[in-house]
């Protein structure tokens, strides 16, 4: 029986290099493949594809203006991290944000603490640490 490919999600972005760095550093992901149009990042059992938008307008992202956070997106990527607090710092350094500690929530039955945030282009992302 053939092995199934790893589950993955694709995030469409304006700046592939910047967004690859953001996700790579936020969730300690390894770069599996990278070219001018896309990058494939991997963390245990999951791949995230950072793919260039084609023909879409650039969102306001890091040029000093506000980032439009797409809260009602059809997809939210949830990534495992060692520490939500550390992820919050990394996200801020790279132009994104993770909400403050009072917005974190615990899922005892699923074994994690989570907090939402956004990447530098406004895509919603959630970080999850093991519940201790």
Predicted regions and their residues:
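Short glycine-/small-residue motifs
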Residues: 124-127
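Vicinal oxygen chelate
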Residues: 1-8, 29-80, 88-118, 129-132
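A conserved hydrophobic helix/loop-capping motif in glycosyltransferases and polysaccharide synthases
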Residues: 10-12
């Amino acid at each position: 029986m053939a092995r199934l490919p790893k589950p993955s999600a694709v995030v469409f972005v304006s700046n592939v290099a910047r967004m690859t760095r953001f996700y790579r550093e936020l969730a300690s992901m390894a770069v599996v493949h990278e070219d001018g149009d896309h990058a494939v990042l991997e963390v245990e059992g999951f791949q995230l594809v950072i793919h260039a938008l084609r023909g879409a307008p650039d969102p306001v992202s890091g040029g000093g203006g506000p980032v439009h956070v797409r809260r009602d997106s059809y997809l939210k990527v949830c990534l495992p991290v060692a520490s939500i607090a550390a992820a919050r710092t990394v996200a801020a350094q790279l132009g994104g944000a993770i909400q403050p500690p009072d917005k974190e929530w615990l899922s005892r039955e699923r074994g994690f603490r989570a907090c939402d945030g956004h990447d530098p282009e406004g895509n919603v992302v959630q970080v999850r640490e093991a519940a201790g």
